[in-house]
Amino acid sequence: MIDNNKHNQDINASSANTIKKDELSESACKIDSIIDPKDDQIIQLQIQLAQIKEHERNTILRLKAEIENIQRRNIQEIEKAHKFALDRFVSELLPVIDNLERTLGIIDRSNTTLSAIIEGIDLTLKSFLDTVYKFGVKSIHEIHIPFNPEIHQAISTMESEKYESNQVLTIVQKGYSLNGRLVRPAMVIVAKSKS
């Protein structure tokens, strides 16, 4: 009877195990059928998330590049502003330079009573020019060079056998540039060939 009971218990345990295994496998199938659509949805969401992250990363990179470009342009504009802030000031100083040069050109240097005044004007002009040259001002005063409409303004032409046509013969009024930018063109007389 003990053997029978043991045998019955084994059979009962075995059939209980089989029933549990069947139930588990049915549950697993149900879970699989439940999980599968959710897995697909999870995968789709992960793909969308990756795309959004990539788009966001690209947007951030683009914005960083745009910010760097704006900063670079601002720095360049500030440099230009510093470089050419003196433009108007230099334009106002040019008539003073012209007047000092004209004075030295017409004054009688042989008059000994004026020698101290002449020397004072000469030193003043030299000091004044040295000062403006320190700030990037350059004079345009070369003669016997080809006429350049970017830096010269022809006010007259003169026939010449000695110089080629379109050569600068005389500077009537010096021109000036500030850091490579023209402030005032040089007023010149240009050679033309004899007809």
Swiss-Prot record:
A cellular-component GO term for this protein: cytosol
**Could you tell me the keywords of this UniProt record?**
Chaperone, Cytoplasm, Stress response
The protein's matches in Pfam families, at most eight in alphabetical order, are given as:
GrpE
Instruction: Select a single GO molecular function from the record's annotations and give it.
Output: adenyl-nucleotide exchange factor activity
Query: What InterPro entries does this protein's entry cite?
Result: GrpE, GrpE_coiled_coil, GrpE_head
Its domain of life reads: Bacteria
User: Which cellular compartments is it found in?
Assistant: Cytoplasm
Q: Some GO term, biological process aspect, for this entry: which one?
A: protein folding
Q: What family is it from?
A: Belongs to the GrpE family.
Its subunit composition reads: Homodimer.
Job description of the protein: Participates actively in the response to hyperosmotic and heat shock by preventing the aggregation of stress-denatured proteins, in association with DnaK and GrpE. It is the nucleotide exchange factor for DnaK and may function as a thermosensor. Unfolded proteins bind initially to DnaJ; upon interaction with the DnaJ-bound protein, DnaK hydrolyzes its bound ATP, resulting in the formation of a stable complex. GrpE releases ADP from DnaK; ATP binding to DnaK triggers the release of the substrate protein, thus completing the reaction cycle.
Concerning HAMAP family, the annotation shows: GrpE
Q: What is this protein called?
A: Protein GrpE
